[in-house]
Amino acid sequence: MLQSNEYFSGKVKSIGFTSSSTGRASVGVMAEGEYTFSTAQPEEMTVVSGALHVLLPGETEWKTYEAGQVFHVPGHSEFHLQVAEPTSYLCRYL
């Protein structure tokens, strides 16, 4: 079953799903802006198009991830994103 989600007054939208090849995941798009997300469990984020400027928990330097690149976020944590152009992503819940 597909589940639609909307965050930050509609600037981030995603569709959640579960599949045998991916497990529990969501795909979505972020508009330009700055966002802080909290995680309940570990996540694997893959940038599909565009780029995400990311500050991960425990880090002091921002890192940019572009299309095809992956980063991991620990569970029960927060991470910060800066988005300069509309960017699509795949988030797998590990």
UniProtKB/Swiss-Prot annotation:
Keywords: Glycosyltransferase, Transferase. Pfam families: Ppnp. The keyword Electron transport does not apply. It catalyses: a purine D-ribonucleoside + phosphate = a purine nucleobase + alpha-D-ribose 1-phosphate; adenosine + phosphate = alpha-D-ribose 1-phosphate + adenine; cytidine + phosphate = cytosine + alpha-D-ribose 1-phosphate; guanosine + phosphate = alpha-D-ribose 1-phosphate + guanine. Gene3D superfamilies: Jelly Rolls. InterPro entries: Ppnp, RmlC-like_jellyroll, RmlC_Cupin_sf. Catalyzes the phosphorolysis of diverse nucleosides, yielding D-ribose 1-phosphate and the respective free bases. Can use uridine, adenosine, guanosine, cytidine, thymidine, inosine and xanthosine as substrates. Also catalyzes the reverse reactions. Belongs to the nucleoside phosphorylase PpnP family. This is Pyrimidine/purine nucleoside phosphorylase. The gene is ppnP.
